[in-house]
A protein has these predicted regions:
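Helix-to-loop junction immediately C-terminal to a conserved catalytic motif
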Residues: 48
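Conserved ABC transporter NBD signature motif
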Residues: 56-66, 73
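Catalytic Walker B motif of ABC-type/P-loop ATPase nucleotide-binding domains
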Residues: 161-164
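Conserved ABC ATPase signature
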Residues: 136-140
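ABC ATPase nucleotide-binding domains
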Residues: 234-257
Length: 257
């Protein structure tokens, strides 16, 4: 579904991405981990066609970027990010915000099709959010808004869902509720690509992990192969132990490491 071959992005003398090659298949769900500035978000922007490489080849859903209409490819990609959330209108009712996802609008300026309204309500009910459907988006907590973004991203029934730190800024309770909704995506035929700083956010949904440092991959493969002491130390520059509990990895920093 997603193939990057020897992708580099150069700005001045800086390699933001440096010879990145990775293959993501339809039956796989990927988490991308790394420190701030490691190139994670830039990698997502390559996948969505909002940035193009200085060198290399990007292929998504069988389409090679630079040889296709990227706007058409994006219709099959759901996207969640804080920057997108900030562009939405806080006074709009929740169901309407969700419904805009069917058309890639930020808000409606005309009558909303009944079909879109019904699907928006259905997705909100699926997430036990139906009681908030008529509330203005601005009255919701940060965690609730993130769930609205998730419902919105599913409106167009995408083949790929790309999430850029969807749990950033959430307290422990709201983070775990959001992660539960993300893990429930196992029930859908959709490939998920998820960027985070935090290893413990890798819920059982995710089958594969890519580790990034300074614009390069330090590891990529199944989560069992990649999440090990040596690669974590190499990626995060810290000595830590990794433990698995409840199908999720948890990290413990070694004192003095």
């Amino acid at each position: 579904m997603i193939s990057l071959q020897h992708v580099s992005l150069v700005r001045g003398n800086r390699h933001i991405l440096d010879d990145v090659s990775i293959e993501m298949k339809s039956e796989q769900n990927w988490a991308i981990l790394g420190r701030n500035g490691s190139g994670k978000t830039t990698l997502l922007e390559m996948m969505t066609g909002y940035m193009f490489p200085s060198r290399g080849r990007v292929e998504v859903l069988g389409h090679v970027y630079g040889q296709c209409d990227v706007r058409e490819v994006r219709k099959s990609i759901g996207y969640i990010s804080q920057s997108l959330l900030e562009k939405l209108t806080l006074s709009d009712p929740v169901w309407e915000v969700v419904a805009t996802g069917a058309y890639a609008f930020l808000r409606f300026y005309q009558d909303i099709p009944e079909e879109a309204r019904n699907l928006a309500y259905s997705l909100l009910n699926e997430m036990n959010f139906g009681h908030l459907a008529e509330q203005p988006l601005g009255t919701l907590s940060q965690g609730e808004r993130k769930k609205v973004m998730l419902a919105r991203s599913l409106m167009a029934d995408p083949k790929i869902l790309i999430m850029d730190e969807p749990c950033a800024g959430l307290d422990l309770y709201e983070r775990e509720k959001m992660l539960q909704e993300i893990d429930n995506l196992r029930q859908r035929e959709i490939m998920v690509v998820y960027v985070t700083h935090h290893i413990e956010e890798i819920v059982p949904l995710f089958t594969h992990v890519a580790l990034m440092k300074d614009g390069r991959l330090t590891g990529a493969g199944t989560k069992e192969e990649v999440l090990n002491h040596e690669l974590i130390k190499q990626t995060y520059d810290i000595d830590a132990q990794l433990e698995w509990d409840g199908g999720r990895p948890w990290i413990k920093v070694i004192s003095g490491g």
